[in-house]
Regions:
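Conserved N-terminal entry element of GNAT/NAT acetyltransferase domains
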Residues: 1-27, 139-140, 151-173
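Conserved donor-binding loop and adjoining core beta-sheet/short helix segment
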Residues: 6-14, 18-112, 223-243, 252
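A structural microfeature
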Residues: 70-71, 142-144, 230-231, 261, ...
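Acyl-donor-binding surface of acyltransferase catalytic domains
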Residues: 75-165, 171, 305-309
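Conserved acetyl-CoA-binding loop-helix of GNAT-fold acetyltransferases
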Residues: 91-107, 251-253, 257-274, 291, ...
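Conserved hydrophobic beta-strand within the GNAT/NAT acetyltransferase core sheet
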Residues: 118-121, 246, 279-284
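Conserved active-site tyrosine of GNAT-family acetyltransferases
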Residues: 129-133, 292-294, 298
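Flexible, substrate/cofactor-facing loop regions flanked by secondary structure
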Residues: 154-244
Length: 312
């Protein structure tokens, strides 16, 4: 079968969203492709807040003669690329063309050494993609991302917090400012100025809240005895795939090692289950994070690896 490649157009946002839902179900609800919420989060955070666009330059579609989507190639972070394919239409020729497009169009200049580089992700054990990447001269992977999941069927654990802490949905106003501040502290612990900037202008978080799947009642926070936000976990419930994804999850440095992130996740998963979710997901890029999520019940996983090629 022949496919036609073209660049992203604004009308494709909803089409790609539906494509990811459909192929996720085709793949038995395993994250072979992205879930719908990751696409939304990248568009409304990566592109809107972190200058990872424009979409018209960072996303390519392959379509059948009937105009149906067969595959999507997109970045997440500059130069780091993901291949999303309809499993029934996947061929070596199509995947080869997608990798070639990434090499040609979706590279970046490394901030560390100033060299041109391109990265493509592959699930470990995917012999077809790994053979293509080797043929194109990609280095064997060093960095990996785990996609962890658990069943939400059956009884789920109640959130447990230290005395004086409470777990609930995030409020607005001052609490939103505090949530933005803690996000900066948690993800940039060596840069307090970043946390202050996060709180001074919350436009970035308002952008995330524009994502179609965002729900305030699933934006979970743990609140300390003094009323400050101590930890958070945002849950994305998809009523088509009946899944719940945790992203992001973090705890303020001064409140860590109290089980607060786990409590937020458990609260979010229970709420999502009440809405109909039957499977929960959370991604991790480090051993400590993976260990935390395993304790929270996410004991099943598949691993993705980032292959990098240095360009001339």
């Amino acid at each position: 079968m022949e496919f036609t490649r073209r660049a992203y157009e604004p009308r494709d946002f909803w089409r790609i969203r539906a494509f990811l839902r459909d192929t996720f179900l085709q793949n038995g609800r395993e994250e072979i492709n992205w879930q719908c919420c990751r696409w939304e989060y990248w568009v409304w955070h990566g592109v809107a807040n972190r200058d990872e666009g424009p979409l018209e330059e960072k996303v390519f579609l392959w379509e059948t003669a009937d105009g149906e989507i067969a595959a999507v190639l997109n970045s997440e972070s500059k130069g780091s690329n993901f291949l999303q394919l309809d499993p029934e239409l996947r061929t070596e020729e199509l995947e080869d063309e997608m990798v070639a497009t990434a090499v040609e169009r979706l590279w970046t200049v490394s901030k560390k050494d100033g060299k041109k580089k391109v990265a493509v992700w592959s699930h470990e054990g995917d012999g077809l993609r790994e053979s293509i990447l080797r043929r194109y001269g990609f280095d064997e992977p060093v960095f990996r991302e785990r996609q962890n999941w658990r069943s939400l069927e059956g009884e789920l654990p109640e959130p447990v917090t230290p005395a004086g802490y409470a777990v609930r949905a995030m409020g607005d106003g001052a609490e939103l400012l505090d949530r933005c501040y803690v996000s900066g502290l948690a993800f940039h612990p060596d840069d307090p100025a970043f946390a202050h900037e996060n709180r001074e202008d919350v436009t970035w978080y308002r952008n995330i809240q524009k994502a179609p799947l965002y729900r305030r009642d699933l934006d979970i926070v743990a609140v300390a005895p003094d009323g400050a936000v101590a930890s958070f976990a945002t849950i994305w419930f998809d009523d088509v795939t009946l899944t719940a994804v945790c992203e992001p999850v973090a705890t303020s440095p001064r409140h860590q090692r109290k089980g607060l992130a786990t409590a937020c996740i458990h609260e979010g998963m229970k709420r999502a289950k009440a809405m109909g979710a039957t499977k929960g997901f959370v991604g991790s890029g480090s051993e400590p994070a993976s260990a935390t999520y395993e304790k929270a019940g996410f004991t099943e996983r598949i691993t993705m690896a980032q292959w990098i090629k240095e360009l001339d």
